[in-house]
A protein has these predicted regions:
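Short, solvent-exposed positions on alpha-helices
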Residues: 10, 54, 125-128
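A structural signal for well-ordered alpha-helices, especially hydrophobic packing surfaces
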Residues: 50, 138-141
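Charged, amphipathic alpha-helical coiled-coil/dimerization segments
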Residues: 25, 72-135, 139
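N-terminal helix-turn-helix DNA-binding core of bacterial DNA-binding proteins
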Residues: 21-66
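Short, charged, intrinsically disordered terminal tails
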Residues: 142-150
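Short amphipathic alpha-helical segments with heptad-repeat character
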Residues: 6-9, 13, 17, 61, ...
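N-terminal leader segment of winged-helix/HTH proteins
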Residues: 1-34
Length: 150
């Protein structure tokens, strides 16, 4: 007899957590061993052109003060830098610094390796279907997506 089905949210979370753990391990093993999981979760949300603190807090679903503390730590460790926001003189943008860029490159390589492993495990067709399905589901679940649902 088969037990109850595992909650779909858990099924989505398990591979995410696996990927997150492996990426953070790869980053730490590459010499960025001062980076914590909480810092990495904020760091990964920084937009290519920089992000405002309030946007990072909203996306991380954390208090602005908590994110500010993490960004302060990231800045002290030279992963990020604060620069004036060209659109608003009163605001500052958090941008990825050179050290952060090097860590991000390691993270991207680890991400690519994991995707490759999953593609082999599932097969190309099923992996592509999974990717397409998750992108479609994102349309109705991600409040930060560039294209809001119709």
């Amino acid at each position: 007899m088969q037990g109850p089905a595992v909650n779909i949210g858990v099924l989505l979370f398990i591979p995410y957590r696996h990927m997150e753990d492996r990426i953070l391990k790869a980053v730490r093993d590459s010499g960025f061993d001062d980076l914590t999981l909480a810092q990495a979760r904020v760091f990964q949300r920084i937009a290519p052109g920089g992000s405002r603190l309030t946007d990072l807090a909203e996306q991380a679903q954390m208090a602005k003060q908590s994110v500010a503390g993490l960004v302060d730590e990231l800045e002290r460790m030279h992963y990020v830098r604060r620069v004036p926001d060209p659109d608003d003189r009163r605001a500052r943008l958090i941008k990825i610094a050179a050290r952060g860029q090097r860590a991000a490159e390691v993270a991207q390589a680890a991400h690519d390796q994991i995707r490759s492993e999953w593609r082999v495990h599932l097969g190309a067709r099923r992996f592509d279907q999974l990717q397409a399905t998750l992108e479609e589901l994102r349309e109705i679940t991600d409040p930060f997506t560039a294209t809001p649902p119709a």
